[in-house]
Amino acid sequence: MQKQEETLSRLRTIFDIFLRENFSTTNNVYFEKLLTHLQAKENAFVLQAPFVVEWVDRCITAVTEDFKKIHPKVISFMLNLTSFLANNEWMIVRLRELDIVNRAVKLLQREHNLSPSIKLGGIRLMKAITVYSMGLAFLRMHRIWTLLIQYSNNDHTLYVVREARQVLYNMVYKSCDKLHDKAVTLEILSEIMQPIHDNLYKNTDGVERIHVKVDDNEMLHKISSTLDLLSYILQQTLVLEERTTLIILLKEHHDFEITVWKLIDMTHNPYFTEKIFTTLSSYNFALLLHEKLLNPNATEPSEEFTEFGLAFFNLMKFLITRKDGLSFVKLAELNHVLWKKLGPRAPKEIVIQQERVTFENQLICFHMLPLLFSMKYAQKIADEESKIELFDAYVVKLLEISCEQTLRLCYTMRDNFFSADGMAVGLVTAGLANKCIHSLLALENVLDREQAVTVCQALLYVLREAVAMSVITNNGEDDCHSVSSAGSSYLKLYPRGTEQVVNDPQVLHSVMVGLRTLIERFKITWKESVETIGLVNCLAFVLENTSMDARCTVQALKLVQLAVEHFLSPNMALLVDNLQGSALVCLGPIIVKRMHDTMWEVRDTTLELTTSIASISRIKFPAFQRFLIDSKIPPIVYEMAKNDSEVYVRASAFQCLSQMVSINLLWENGLSQLDLVDHLLFVMYRETNDIVRSEAVITLMKIYEHRKIHEKYKNTLFSTLNYCVIGDHHTEVKLNALNFWRREFYRQFSNQGMIDGSFPTVTFSKEQKKIVTLTEKEIQTSIAKVFGEVQQYGYFGILLKCLREETSMEVLEFLIKGVKTMTEKFERYKGIMEEIEMRSPLSDRERPRFDFPSQPQPTPIPQQPPVNPTEADEVIESILNSQDAQLLEKAFETQMQINAQGKTAEKRHIDEFYYKQFAVPLRQFFEELKTIDLDQLVKQHQEWFECKENFTSLLDDILGALKRDDENMISDCY
């Protein structure tokens, strides 16, 4: 209760400051934070405090008297606060008594030059009171929809327009279908439609005629916002579960479809045409849903969509006659989105003119149509029977999924976009092809799998076109990945001119991005699309093009990686022991070449591809192991890890090496001869980049798991690990180093005979080289050996230091989880502590010294005996009188020798006995652990990292900020 009183006291002070006549602030963020806290459930008591409503009353009274008296941010804050109060039914009574809402609405209607934040606050207040029928009646009485239409139509900010449209839709929908007030509904609709009617019709001498004024910018701008508002309202009705009569009112009282169609005569502007057709499409779908699918009195079968289908095809045909390819593709995308909004209410198959079709398939055909025009290469592979059969099968598939009207439109588009002799007239452009692909990718989350496969096949054929075009351009010779071409005869194929589309780098990039997105999203394999079998061949040719830009090269490499991961059948690994005769053979030289590319993005992506190949080669496709060795890739990867100038490339190289070191063939044929361990320890200690150190720890852990590390590195290894846990500032490095320690535990216990977390009754002893029976005493001895070993290397010391000093939440959670597990396991065995102390006692000099110097300690200067003043004078005189010209030269040489010695003295590795300062006995570790509340530690850090601001502290911050603003105002006066 006392805390609430403190909060209210501070808030009352802040509210009083807000109403000062000279109030000004430079920090607007505090208003938003304050509103957020006031809206929270735990602060509901604030809104119930009497002074809050009284402050709102004082504020709106002051604003009514003199608008400029109150700061605009305070007015906006007041309106938002009033909307919070209106959410409480009991507060509505108090608001009515003080006439607050009425005065707020009059303020909004009276003032025209309000700031967007004030308008937004007013709209939110209206939104809050529309929840109540009494509030809706109040807004209706004030004809508030005129203000909302104004906010929706004029040049306002995105937030104002969005909120205004939402409130307006709620008003018109509730008036129509909840209150059944037809008169008010028609009045609102008439107000919305007025800009269209005013500019579309002219009354001359009592005779109504159509007024046509083509491409008047001011008029188009006004009508565009009206069309946007109508489209929003119509599309909102598509998510309703109940039927609304809004659509039939638009149809009967405004002849909506014909009225909007007439706007077409006013413009040749593609942008405005797109707005018109968006509105018409939204209307068609709303009419379909509410007058057919949700109408219980509908007489036609639910699958009969002839009227809807013809309306859709008319829209598409009009855009073809206008030769507007971009709007054509955009309209297909919009219809796809609207169709998906119908959800399960729409049948899977519909009937259009006695023909049963899948509507989404028609949309997909229209999406791909500009791309399909560029498929000429299939005509050149007629001599390859298998390929022409594949393409024929794909064409037949397109014909089967298309209805008659769709095919007619396809031919109409061909005739309009190409001349009679098949020459492109500049309408099928690279920009249009790009839009097709981007439009399809925008529907990635709504496409069915079957449609995604159809699109993927089309993109594969477009990629082949790009390869065929490159053959002609570069006069390439046939090899394992090239295509058969007949030279310039390709360019003469029908239709001519489309080769410029597939030859565009942006189109090629979009095609590869589209393929990768669809294959990843829908897990497409060669079983669904046989065309994917030739994907690597095409990409190999693309990658051999030295003039290819970096973006395309990166996407091609990523697509090759995806093809290797998805399209290699695991069963083939049993039949193939090498890659001879496969297009994959060509990848070796390509990978090596791209590893030396000047662009670091290309080198990095090449390493990702190599990492994937190495991962697959371990089990799934062993033939890749010999592929990597023959191409001499492992040594190149190691050199990149050591010497590449880009940190991301070095990190990727270590990631690649971590996959390679576990493969015996790669280790024995190259990696074992490299100084991997030495360099990794150097990187973990000396590297300045975080991600490189992190990957280096993982790589060293993989080597430690699968290979033997030389005994001379053992002390340095654990010292470096402890340094990474204690001295490194990067969370990932710490976690990887701790994970390394965890793996060391697993390895030690495994060596002692533990299997799946427990000791069996019988095991094979490596020491005695025979099968032995494990007793309780022998198990304790084995555990003692493990704990003695890790105790010696300082594991328990670094745990304690981290628990007391660590600030990273992830590291703490990892540590605490491990400590709790270890404590639970340890309590199962009694007397084990004495066994550990007996087996591995720590000497006094090995006791921990928790000092971690951030800088190396300076070497003390040796004390020299004092120099006699007389001798000093003689030395100075001898130097001054010296004629030795080499004096400075000798001094310079001496300095150079000192610098050289200092440079070589810089150590590559950490002190190998660094670990000893953390060697804590296990008994001391558990005693120290008892003084730490682990759960409280996690809770405390959780509060820090979630940054939960206390409401009272926020109010203190606001008071401090307001005080500083006042001081600044006073200083400005002088």
UniProtKB/Swiss-Prot annotation:
Residues 855-868 have a biased composition (Pro residues). A motif (BRAT1-like motif) lies at residues 972-974. InterPro entries: ARM-like, ARM-type_fold, BRAT1. The keyword Zinc applies. Keywords: Cytoplasm, Metal-binding, Zinc. Residues 837-850 have a biased composition (Basic and acidic residues). GO terms for biological process: cell population proliferation; DNA damage response; integrator complex assembly. The keyword Cytoplasm applies. GO terms for cellular component: cytosol; nucleus. Residues 837-871 are annotated as: Disordered. It is found in: Cytoplasm, Cytosol. SUPFAM superfamilies: ARM repeat. Zn(2+) binds at C973. Its main location: cytoplasm. Belongs to the BRAT1 family. Interacts with IntS9 and IntS11. Required for the assembly of the RNA endonuclease module of the integrator complex. Associates with IntS9 and IntS11 in the cytoplasm and blocks the active site of IntS11, thereby inhibiting IntS11 endonuclease activity before formation of the full integrator complex. The BRAT1-like motif mediates inhibition of the endonuclease activity of INTS11 by forming hyrogen bond and hydrophobic interactions with the active site of INTS11: Cys-973 coordinates one of the two active site zinc ions of IntS11. This is Integrator complex assembly factor Brat1. The gene is Brat1.
